[in-house]
Design a protein with these regions (language model features):
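Beta->alpha loop/short-helix hinge microenvironment recognizer with preference
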Residues: 1-391
Length: 391
């Protein structure tokens, strides 16, 4: 038995055999290499010396891969903090867009196109319905984030949208619906279904889709038509969570969803020579946590399913929050509402200062004597220090 193991440990033990027996994409292989070599010295080191006692500190560089569980916290904190300047004292809602599980094989075989289609369908649904005077009649703002996993690391692509519950009408007047969401869920469902299925059908008619693995049967014309009919007939079930309790809760909530990966280290409970045990929420049992044991290679397979395509943008901003609009329109909204501007806490701070603020840890302070440590030039030839000199 192996306690307190990490995802890096799991990859070290099981990935080599998995790679030799499975078809792995270059992007997945790169992510696996990064995870296995993060903070091992493979990506270089930072060497510092204490000005007072001469104690030498060696810090191994991280891989900075967005799929690495050890590399998400710092960029998440910086990203979320930067969003403070876009937040208004206004209603916000969390809307989740899901698709029928029958589409999963097709989506997995065509991630670049069909992930993009999820964003297109979700964003067009929100923008068009919000602009309809029957509902709100405004230009709203929202952030969309793609997640591809369920709690057990199964393939479950869905979009999380953090939606501003009000917006600007054609006369640049602010309108909102108070604490009630301005769009009926059934209308969202039908509109989203129509838009996503239309784009899927268009890709199919233009011969842009590929059919690999469990999607292979849908190469057949009649099988694909039956799949379309099945999904059209189903009621798609997006849902809207209750409004956030103030701007700060929106900021905290963003942190929960923006830089997540399929599974974090704290959920790994045990590892043996052949299996991995991890915790997962059981949504059939009121969301209670349970432990699941699977083979090590199955763990690797599930994890790698969620490596996004190369250069794929997972966090996207729309409407009032788009980069084109937000500087002018968010300022206008803030003036109309009379709400204060939330200032970034970390803006213009260097990494040591951010770490000191967030984690109460001074990386410029010698852990041995408390003196000031300074970096050695990276180009300087470094002779391995004797053990007694290391902090």
């Amino acid at each position: 038995m192996s306690k307190d193991c990490t995802i890096q440990d799991v990859f070290h033990r099981f990935y080599p055999s998995f790679e030799s027996t499975h078809d792995i994409s270059p992007t997945q292989r790169k992510a696996a290499y990064h995870i296995m070599n993060c903070k091992t010295g493979a990506f270089g080191v930072n060497v510092s010396v204490c000005e007072d006692c001469g104690c030498i500190s060696v810090h191994y560089n991280s891989c900075r891969d967005r799929c690495c569980p050890m590399c998400q916290e710092f960029p998440k904190e910086k990203w979320v903090d930067a969003r403070r300047e876009d937040i208004l004292d206004a209603p916000y809602f969390h809307v989740v867009f899901t698709v029928p599980e029958e589409l999963n094989p097709i989506i997995y075989s065509n991630q670049k196109f069909l992930y993009a289609a999820l964003y297109h369908a979700a964003s067009d649904t929100l923008s068009e319905l919000a602009a309809d005077s029957k509902y709100l009649g405004t230009d709203i703002g929202y952030i969309c984030i793609l997640h591809t996993w369920g709690s057990t690391m199964n393939f479950h692509p869905h979009i999380h949208a953090i939606v501003l519950g009000g917006g600007l009408d054609v006369k640049n007047h602010w309108k909102d619906n108070g604490k009630d969401f301005f769009l009926p869920i059934k209308v969202i469902s039908k509109t989203f279904r129509g838009k996503y299925m239309a784009e899927l059908k268009q890709l199919w008619e233009n011969d842009r889709l590929e059919f690999h693995g469990s999607a292979a049967p849908y190469k057949n014309y009649y099988a694909f038509k039956e799949l379309l009919n099945t999904c059209y007939a189903k009621e798609w079930i997006p849902y809207c969570k209750k409004p956030f309790d103030g701007a700060e809760s929106v900021i905290r909530y963003l942190g929960k969803y923006t830089h997540r990966i399929a599974i974090s280290n704290y959920r790994i409970k045990d590892m043996t020579e052949s299996t991995v045990t991890f915790s997962a929420k059981d949504y059939k049992n009121q969301g209670l946590w349970k432990e699941i044991t699977i083979s090590g290679e199955e763990f690797i397979r599930r994890f790698l399913m969620h490596v996004p395509p190369k250069r794929f943008v997972r966090i996207r901003h729309y409407g009032l929050l788009s980069s084109r609009n937000k500087k002018k329109k968010i300022t206008l909204c803030r003036n109309i509402l009379g709400c204060k501007k939330y200032i970034s806490k970390l803006k213009d701070m260097d990494a040591p200062a951010i770490i000191r603020l967030l984690y109460n840890k001074d990386i410029c302070k010698c852990s041995s004597c408390g003196g000031k440590i300074i970096p050695l030039p990276t180009e300087q030839h470094f002779i391995k220090p004797k053990p007694h000199m290391l902090c």
